[in-house]
Amino acid sequence: ETIASVLAQKYKVKKTQGNFNNEIGLPLTVFTLEESDEIAVLEMGISDFGEMTRLTAIACPDVCVITNIGWCHLENLKTRDGILKAKTEIFKSMNPDGTVILNGDDDKLITIKDVYDKKPVFIGIENKSGIYAENIVNNGLEGMTARICNVNTADNINDFDVHIPVAGIHMVYNSMAAAAVGAEFGLTSEQIADGIANMETLAGRNHIIRTDSLLILDDCYNANPVSMKSSIDVLASSKGRKVAILGDMFELGEEEKQLHYGVGEYFKDKNIDVLITVGELSKNIAAGVRTVSACDVHSYDTKDELEKDFSKLLKKGDNILVKASHGMQFTKIVDSLEKLEL
């Protein structure tokens, strides 16, 4: 979304819609391309080896962006090294003269020294070898501000200040990636800053909903341990009573219980008032929280059971994070919260 918003400042852009990022959705997106479209921004989602090879053969990208090597899809990919191997299959059918943009703060991605004898463009906060961010200010749910700097003086972009309308440090990385792509396609610093500042959020992805009773942080499109912790940070930055409604994270393999427990331990010093979990695996989040926080903890087996207790658990003015893997269908919880009167 951030990359598409930036490129749209200069070009006619087609982007992936919803979850059309797999071996069915990607071709359907490509089929919608029109002669007037100048750039396609395509998301590629995988869960096993070989899938990225097939996707990149369809898209043949000129620019490849990998934002991190996290802890998702471990059921098939087993380890973060496996995830790295699967994601870097994207290089197989990319334009050999194209550009690779990587998160230089990621311990796995930083090991990639060249692709087709060309060095990647690294983005980072700690890594300052390419495009980096400094002077980062967290304004809670109002978003972030930062200064994005560029080491490569041959690009069109100079150092610039930017307002990032979506909270979370991950959005700083997304903004740096968008700046790197923008530089590749000849955008100016002003165009990049405008594209980032005017980015729109989608339902289920860091989307803020304000009702008469509640502020809802709808991030229920999907979840893994890295994104779950990022969303907890966003909730922690809000003002007022903080409630996290978290569900199971799928496809984590043999370490699924420990990874859920680790999310719970991440609550330490976050000053979150209430944790509500739904599902069997997320009970491990609750167990982890109890070891590090005085947070009020409640666990439910089903969404229906939880919704019956909304009036007991929630107060008017609460800030509520809703997040789980897509298969948990937490959009139903978001819909119910939107209708709730307290």
Predicted regions, residues:
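Acidic-glycine-rich active-site phosphate/pyrophosphate-binding loop
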Residues: 1-4, 137-160, 205-208
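Phosphate-binding loop of NTP-binding sites
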Residues: 1-99, 104, 110-116, 176, ...
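ATP-dependent carboxylate-amine ligase
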Residues: 4, 76, 88, 96, ...
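Glycine/charged-rich beta-loop-alpha catalytic/anionic-binding loops adjacent to active sites
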Residues: 10, 125, 151, 155-164, ...
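Conserved RecA-like helicase motor-core motifs
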Residues: 12-18, 123-125, 295-299
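A short glycine-threonine-serine/GTX helix/turn-capping micro-motif
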Residues: 53, 162-169
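Short, polar loop motifs at secondary-structure junctions
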Residues: 104-108, 125-126, 279-283
